[in-house]
């Protein structure tokens, strides 16, 4: 995810193996869904998706392309 804090972006693609994609889908990260970056601390993110705040480490966040 490359965007600024407070900016709403749309998920274009999710990369990784099937297990990673399934995990992210279960959290609500689906292609076409809008997300907002709430906080970025050294690449570790807190994002708002569907009204929920989710923490992602740098490696997991890198799998979500916007």
What are these regions (language model features)?
Residues 1-66:
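Compact, glycine-rich, soluble single-domain proteins
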């Amino acid at each position: 995810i490359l965007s600024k804090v407070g900016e709403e972006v749309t998920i274009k693609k999710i990369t990784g193996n099937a297990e990673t994609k399934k995990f992210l889908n279960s959290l609500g990260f689906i292609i076409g869904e809008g997300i907002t970056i709430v906080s970025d601390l050294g690449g570790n993110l807190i994002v708002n998706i569907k009204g929920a705040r989710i923490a992602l480490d740098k490696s997991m966040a890198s799998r979500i392309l916007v």
